[in-house]
Structure formats: structure tokens, C-alpha cells
């Protein structure tokens, strides 16, 4: 039976101590594209967590039967199957969100976080640990998306999840929206400040 302390570490260390975006600087492209709204960031975060977790689980199950020469192909096939399933479910049950996410759900296949956990962890560890590690890393990625999306949507439009938080000048309120935060460069700045803040708080994460 897996050690609960280790499982807890695998699940929660990617949130702060080993965050895929803040420490490993992975998955940046989709973080720029899907964080203009909190709703799309939530769906993307959940999608990545599920794909990363279950792809690691299935890859771990068959790891001893995969010839080394084709392991990347097998990993990609498993990941692509899960991404296709997620994409089809979104189109079936959340079509408008699927349109907003556009090609970025499909591009989960090429996300370095998913491939990285499959190659670095799932190919060496048992299925349960691989599942927890994958979900943890996907959730850590999703957490960063939520923070970035909250800042961008709130400052950029004065709303969160479509609900008005700050009454804008256009609607007779006091808040003047900042259109810069609805553009991709703002995500770079926010992620940069988050990385700076995290490494100031935890100096051991700073690069030598």
C-alpha cells in the first residue's frame, strides 16, 4: 500500500514547492491564451489535471511492456486519446466554453507538463503514485491559471465569472477598465510577479 505521507507530498508539493509554472516554467503558452476569463481557466485547469493524472496512470500500468525505442509514441497515443475524450465531452456538454478554449484543449497533447510527468515519473513509479502525481501537477498548473485569470478578468473588465464586481464607468460606476490586462502580454507580467514573489518567499527556489 502506498505511503500516505508520500501521496500527500505528491499531491500538494506542485502547488507551491514545485509548481510547474512558477518553478519549472512549463505550460506558459496556454497560460497566456486561456486566462482572459476565470471560467475558461477553471475548465482548462481541470482538463489538464485529469489528462495528466490519467495519462500518467495508464502509462505507469503498461510501462514494463513498452519497448524503450517507442515509449514516446506510446505516451503520445495515450495522452492524445485522453485529450480527444476531454475535447469531445466539452463539445457535447459545454459547447460555448469549448469554442472559447478553441485549439488549446487539443494542444494539451503537447503540454510539457503532461509529457514531463509521463517521462520523468510515470515510467518509473507505480500507477497510484503516478495518478496522484499527475493530478497534483495538473492542479498546481490550474492554480496558477486561476490566479492569473482572476487578476486579468477583474482588472481588465471589472467582472469575475461574468458577474460584475466593479461597476464600470461605462455603466455609470467608478471603475475604469484596463484593456492591457485582456491582452496576452499582461499574463507575462503577472506570471513574472508571481514567480518573483514565490522565490522571494522561498529563496531556495531561486536559480543560481
From Swiss-Prot:
Keywords: Cell inner membrane, Cell membrane, Ion transport, Membrane, NAD, Sodium, Sodium transport, Translocase, Transmembrane, Transmembrane helix, Transport, Ubiquinone. It is found in: Cell inner membrane. GO terms for biological process: sodium ion transport. The chain crosses the membrane at residues 42-62, 72-92, 103-123, 131-151, 178-198. It comes from the Bacteria. GO terms for molecular function: oxidoreductase activity, acting on NAD(P)H, quinone or similar compound as acceptor. Signal peptide: none annotated. NCBIfam families: nqrD (TIGR01939), PRK09292.1 (NF006777), PRK12405.1 (NF009070). Belongs to the NqrDE/RnfAE family. This is Na(+)-translocating NADH-quinone reductase subunit D.
Amino acid at each position: 500500500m502506498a505511503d500516505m505521507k508520500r501521496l500527500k507530498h505528491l499531491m500538494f508539493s506542485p502547488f507551491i514547492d514545485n509548481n510547474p509554472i512558477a518553478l519549472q516554467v512549463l505550460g506558459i503558452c496556454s497560460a497566456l491564451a486561456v486566462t482572459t476569463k476565470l471560467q475558461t481557466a477553471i475548465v482548462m485547469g481541470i482538463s489538464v489535471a485529469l489528462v495528466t493524472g490519467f495519462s500518467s496512470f495508464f502509462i505507469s500500468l503498461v510501462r514494463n511492456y513498452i519497448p524503450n525505442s517507442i515509449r514516446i509514441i506510446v505516451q503520445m497515443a495515450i495522452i492524445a486519446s485522453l485529450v480527444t475524450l476531454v475535447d469531445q465531452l466539452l463539445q457535447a456538454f459545454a459547447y460555448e466554453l469549448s469554442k472559447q478554449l478553441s485549439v488549446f484543449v487539443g494542444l494539451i497533447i503537447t503540454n510539457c507538463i503532461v509529457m514531463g510527468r509521463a517521462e520523468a515519473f510515470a515510467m518509473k513509479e507505480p500507477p497510484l503514485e503516478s495518478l496522484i502525481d499527475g493530478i497534483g501537477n495538473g492542479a498546481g498548473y490550474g492554480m496558477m491559471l486561476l490566479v492569473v485569470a482572476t487578476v486579468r478578468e477583474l482588472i481588465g473588465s471589472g467582472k469575475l465569472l461574468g458577474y460584475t464586481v466593479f461597476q464600470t464607468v461605462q455603466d455609470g460606476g467608478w471603475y475604469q477598465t484596463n484593456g492591457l490586462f485582456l491582452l496576452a502580454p499582461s499574463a507575462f507580467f503577472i506570471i513574472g510577479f508571481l514567480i518573483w514573489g514565490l522565490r522571494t518567499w522561498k529563496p531556495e527556489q531561486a536559480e543560481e
